[in-house]
Amino acid sequence: MQTAIHFEGDQAYICVSDHGKIKEEEPVSYGRSRVEFVIQTAKAQEEGKIAVVFDDATGKIVKDAEEQCIRSGLQQGQVNFFTKEEAALGVVLFRGDNLAKGNTGIFDYTRKHFVYYEVKKQKDSVIVEAKDYTEQIKHAVTDQEKDAAFLTIIKQALARGITTTIYLCGEGFDGNWFSQSTNALCIGRRVFMGKHLFASGAAYLCANRQGEQKVPATVNHTTISQIGLVVHHHGRDMFCPLIMEGKPWEESRGEMEI
């Protein structure tokens, strides 16, 4: 059994994966410390792993959280941290979206930001890109203003390629303020809404981390293609890769002897 926790604002959205089925639980207030909540959840769970999605999952925040989990007595690897980009990929895999027919998009509207995540297939890889539209909607106050701003964002975000599936996630979508923009979204697309999306994606990834997922995936903090040199060797040009695709930029290193 795996438990996935997505922290958003003062709420923890939880999904439990057991024998291939993912169940959503009621959101709970986690108190002052997200990491302490994770530790308590892990210790209360008799077996399995914990998947965690932080809205601000920078390398330092994740490293500090991992060290705190180890100091509390949890085993290495018992808690797995995911970015929202990674969880977005998990959503697509869990829902079974067919990227060969079109892209999948997730509009994430929280108290602090408005971000669009696009998941698309590119040759043999799956690409996850994030675009921040917070500036375009943060000054909208009335329902009409937010609806108009969201409609403009939709036109910009979906201008490239074919998008067949859309998800709306976050507290910002509470209420019925987006009637005009929803009409534009639903033309030729499947549209779903829920607050447990990122938790369900992380639960799927955690459950299948050692499984059969074969599709290479890259997100916007990783390399999207091989990086290398073309060298002339024994009378012909050949490409020598230094860094493979899908590797974090900050951790990527490559060298060769000539």
Predicted regions, residues:
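Conserved phosphate-binding catalytic cores of ATP/NTP-utilizing and phosphoryl-transfer enzymes
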Residues: M1-T3, Q76-Y109, L197-T218
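Phosphate/pyrophosphate-binding loops at sites that engage ATP/ADP/AMP, CoA/4′-phosphopantetheine
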Residues: V38-I50, R95-G96, A148-T165
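Short beta-strand-loop/turn "lid" adjacent to the catalytic site in phosphate-handling enzymes
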Residues: T41-Q68
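N-terminal phosphate-binding loop and adjacent alpha-helix
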Residues: I22-A42, I50, Q136-F150
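Glycine-rich phosphate-binding loop plus the immediately following alpha-helix
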Residues: K121-T152, L205, E250-I258
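Acidic, glycine/GT-rich loop-and beta-edge segments that sit at the periphery of enzyme/chaperone cores
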Residues: Y204-I258
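Gly/Thr-rich phosphate-binding beta-strand-loop-beta motif of the actin/hexokinase/Hsp70
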Residues: M1-E25, L93-K131
